[in-house]
Amino acid sequence: FPTRRSSDLPTWGDKVDKQWGKGPEIFTPENAYKYGKWLGERYMNAPNLIWVIGGDRSGDGKNFAIWNALATGIKSVDKNHLMTYHPHGEHSSSFWFHNASWLDFNMCQSGHAQQDFAIYQRLLLPDLNKEPHKPCMDGEPRYENIPINFKKENGRFGDDDIRHTLYQSMFSGACGYTYGCNDIWQMFDTGREPKCDADTPWYQSMDKQGA
């Protein structure tokens, strides 16, 4: 069996760039580097860990220096683990960090709006042809049971949509695949306020066809 690995996110994206999160924005390039170095020292010998910088956020503007410092801090002491970057929707880590020495493989996010192969022609295929050559994968494809483009009137992504993203990305040369479910990511249950129109308790969604 393949070795199981844990994707570790050093911080939620809203602590760098609030956007739709709660914040507060607490990081600067200086404290991000120190925090990254501390994380690297603490977990450098941990088995089966993959660092995922970003957290559904842009790497542009003021964010660039902060994310770069965080990643550089970790890698300054931790040479043992792979590292990538989780961008916001319909973007790729390669847009900002392809040539960064700490980026071991690219991650794109096809997101929750597109329904055809064109999104991979825009994101994944160009990444695979960039130099230096690095692997790439879709870190956040459409989630099962999430409204298409976040609007209930558009319908919801089903198990067939999940299979489409799997086939389209993997047959294009991706190095892996991510499954997501709207009800599971937020641990939705009756009595909890739903995000993105979640409607099924998470423990029931564990048995959805796409899973």
Regions found by a protein language model. Give the residues of each.
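Active-site mouth of glycoside hydrolases
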Residues: 4-105, 109-117
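Short, structured coil segments at secondary-structure junctions
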Residues: 99-102, 132, 172-173
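Active-site clefts of carbohydrate-active enzymes
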Residues: 57, 90, 94, 103-105, ...
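Aromatic- and carboxylate-lined catalytic core of secreted/periplasmic carbohydrate-active enzymes
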Residues: 135, 144-146, 160-211
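A structural signal for short, well-ordered beta-strand segments and their strand-loop junctions
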Residues: 52, 84, 138, 178-181
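Short, flexible/disordered intra-domain loops and linkers
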Residues: 19-21, 61, 149-159, 189-198
